[in-house]
Swiss-Prot record:
Gene Ontology CC: one annotated term: chloroplast
GO biological process: mRNA processing; RNA splicing; tRNA processing
Organism of origin: Dioscorea elephantipes (Elephant's foot yam)
Family: Belongs to the intron maturase 2 family. MatK subfamily.
This protein's name: Maturase K
Keyword annotations: Chloroplast, mRNA processing, Plastid, RNA-binding, tRNA processing
Organism lineage string: Eukaryota, Viridiplantae, Streptophyta, Embryophyta, Tracheophyta
Entry superkingdom: Eukaryota
Annotated function: Usually encoded in the trnK tRNA gene intron. Probably assists in splicing its own and other chloroplast group II introns.
């Protein structure tokens, strides 16, 4: 199925502006469920669902579509006691299939908009635009001139109707909105995915319907960031357009163009409130960083704005202390698995002119990133590779695998951790993590063969594990010429890492997935 064949569901009156029209009929197409189960559309932004049930065959999909044509299965009422409804916690598998198909159908317009936006701006389609490692070179370039940083945790208890209203601004397909409302209330009643908290309901992204709830969460974050970007765009003296190339920014500026005429006059008196040409905003998942060259008072104004915005727009009360304001030179913030801070180096230069001598103090600022060893040990502990204190233990559930497969799994994790944390200024911190994985691998092999670790290593030799735990520098030396490699022995940022994976979900059903790939 090609993308061009889907445009008929989205275009309106032959205009170039695409709307979310006629999405509901897509649920009756077999290829939608194929996209949800397989690799997405033409290798695009769709995420593969690794834990999808093997029962999702073409026969079941056809049976599901046949049942959906019988509209009585989709009718729901408060006193409905019919146990044969196609959607609900009593028929969880079909509910999961429909919710994933619904999420895919809602993602398709975003894909088409992204493609058209890149073509209009003549931006080549490249995976490098999606790399989260590209954030750190940006911070290295900008942070030396900034003063304050704010850690922001985006609030996520949100009322169900707010989610429906958010999507209502994007789509004119009433049937899809009714289906979305039905899904949310059905999951709430089953107490599986939405748990009640007065007066709102909390969405927890579950493994069973991860794609569906990830789409809803991204829609919510989209609205959270919209006015923030709008105010910054209006108040900035240097109007940068570079952020328009990012995936999450593409739709902001399309919506902003329609919103600008209405809001420009209304917010004209308050724009001076946020004037700051050196304000930078970076977000990954539910955590955001706001850095500024302005004063502490200006950062407090931004915090007040965000708190009131969440309160009046999303009906969510957030305590102001949820947003921390710190001086960048005296604070280390954790972001994307790195501990980052601003190092200040003092250099004394003595200058002499004729009979007079001068002593000049020179301050240089450098953005520094280090590995958060405690966080990595915590992740290894949750994945059952070590104890909470970092003592290696055997991976008992892998003892039924072959020796080569066990070593390959441990080596894969070790290499991917080294690959992701290659930007650390102190790579010696990773030695402890590699030691934990090596000893855990040896303990797992020894447990499988019912022998002691020392005796097992002496029998097979210490070189058994060396091939699978190569250092990142050794791999780079094989790729690049020796002269070029020596000049790049410092921090390295890779542009092929698009998300952070959890170690607990790194390998599912004996399938190994890279650490730098989405689940």
């Amino acid at each position: 199925m090609k993308i061009e064949e889907l445009q008929g569901y989205l275009e309106k009156d032959g205009s170039r502006q695409r709307h979310f029209l006629f999405l509901y009929p897509l649920l009756f197409q077999e290829y939608i469920y194929t996209l949800a189960h397989d690799h997405g559309l033409n290798g695009s932004i769709f995420v593969e669902i690794l834990d999808y049930d093997n029962k999702s065959s073409s026969v079941l999909v056809k049976h599901l579509i046949t049942r959906m044509y019988q509209q009585n299965y989709l009718i729901y009422s408060a006193d409905d006691s019919n146990q044969n409804r196609i959607v609900g916690h009593n028929n969880f598998f079909y509910s999961k299939m429909i919710s994933e198909g619904f999420a895919v159908s809602m993602e398709i317009p975003f894909l088409l908009r992204l493609g058209s936006s890149l073509e209009e701006k003549e931006i080549p389609k490249s995976q490098n635009l999606r790399s989260i490692h590209s954030i750190f070179p940006f911070l290295e370039d900008k942070s030396s001139h900034l003063n304050y940083v704010s850690d922001i945790l985006i609030p996520h208890p949100i009322h169900l109707e707010i989610l429906v209203q958010i999507l209502q601004c994007w789509t004119q397909d009433v049937s899809s909105l009714h289906l979305l409302r039905f899904f949310l209330h059905e999951y709430h009643n089953s107490n599986s995915f939405i748990t009640p908290k007065k007066p709102v309901y909390v969405i927890s992204i579950s493994k069973e319907n991860k794609r569906f709830f990830r789409f809803l969460y991204n829609s919510y974050v989209f609205e959270c960031e919209f006015l923030l970007v709008f105010f910054h765009k209006q108040s900035s003296y240097l109007r940068s357009r570079s952020s328009g190339v990012f995936l999450e920014r593409t739709h902001f500026y399309e919506k902003m163009g329609n919103f600008l005429v209405v809001c420009c006059n209304y917010f004209q008196k308050t724009q001076w409130f946020f004037k700051d040409p050196f304000l930078h905003y970076v977000r990954y998942q539910g955590k955001a960083i706001l850095v500024s060259k302005g004063t502490h008072l200006l950062m407090r104004k931004w915090r007040s704005y965000l708190v009131h915005f969440w309160q009046y727009y999303f009906q969510f009360w957030s305590h102001p202390h949820r947003i921390h304001i710190n001086q960048l030179s005296n604070y280390s913030f954790c972001f994307l698995g790195y501990l980052s801070n601003l190092l200040i180096n003092l250099s004394v230069v003595r200058s002499q002119m004729l009979e007079n001598s001068f002593v000049i103090d020179i301050l240089t600022k450098k953005f520094d990133t280090r590995v958060s060893v405690i966080a990595l040990i915590r992740s290894l502990s949750k994945a059952k590779f070590c104890t909470v204190s970092g003592h290696p233990i055997s991976k008992s559930i892998w003892t039924n695998l072959s020796d080569l497969d066990i070593i390959h799994r441990f080596g894969w994790i070790c290499r991917n951790l080294s690959h992701y944390h290659s930007g650390s200024s102190k790579k010696q911190s990773l030695y402890r993590i590699k030691y934990i994985l090596r000893i855990s691998c040896a303990r797992t092999l020894a447990r499988k063969h019912k022998s002691k670790v020392r005796a097992f290593l002496q029998r097979l030799g210490s070189g058994l594990l060396q091939e699978f735990f190569r250092e990142e520098e050794e791999i780079l030396s094989l790729i690049f010429p020796q002269a070029l490699f020596r000049s790049h022995t410092g921090r390295i940022w890779y542009l092929d890492i698009i998300c952070i994976n959890d170690l607990r979900n790194l390998m599912i059903d004996h399938k190994i997935k890279p650490y730098n790939e989405c689940k």
